[in-house]
Amino acid sequence: MKVSTMREINPKETTRAYAFELWMKAPMPMVTFFKILDVNRLVKISKESGMKFNMLMCWGIGKAASSIKEFYMLPVGDKLMQYDAIAVNTIVMNKDNEVSSCDVPFSADLQLFNEDYLKLTTEVARSCENHDLTESMVIGTSALAQYEIDGAVGMYSGIFNNPFMIWGKYHKGFFRTTLTVSFQFHHTQMDGAHAAKFLDRLQQEINKLLV
């Protein structure tokens, strides 16, 4: 597993200089976008390959984010940090029927990501201990796959500024299977155009996924 690093950078020397000044001390700096994804391909691949739908979603999220430079920066405290790696977080039901948190390092190699996902989530479920990759820029996710929800807003503790995506049950239609997702991001990290590009690329990655 590759060792990732993070370092503090000068916001004034980045493309986020103005956003840093404008949003770092805002009482609510988080923005939420909603999007309906066509996940018919993921459902089909999951059934045919045995790969978990949630793992495929997490990989697609990481793949879409990995080509957008804003995902390698994150405001932490009162600083702007630069990362050289991305991870995707997933929530795991542990052996005590409680939830634990598991960061999975992103790899463009789907098979490798799947191996890490299965290994790490199994360990977290067994140990009931979170697996945190503090040196990676972590994209949070939460899959409430048994429930009909449209998304969530206002998830801001004032401590964690990480981007976060949540979804519920997918809907099977006559011609396609859809999934409504909500994507929350810190306005210092990215603008709306970057977030919209990310969501479009997520759909593109889903559409062209091959196993």
Regions found by a protein language model. Give the residues of each.
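Acyl-group handling in specialized metabolite and lipid biosynthesis
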Residues: 30-35, 42-48, 99-111, 190
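Small-residue-rich loop/turn and linker elements
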Residues: 71-103, 134-135
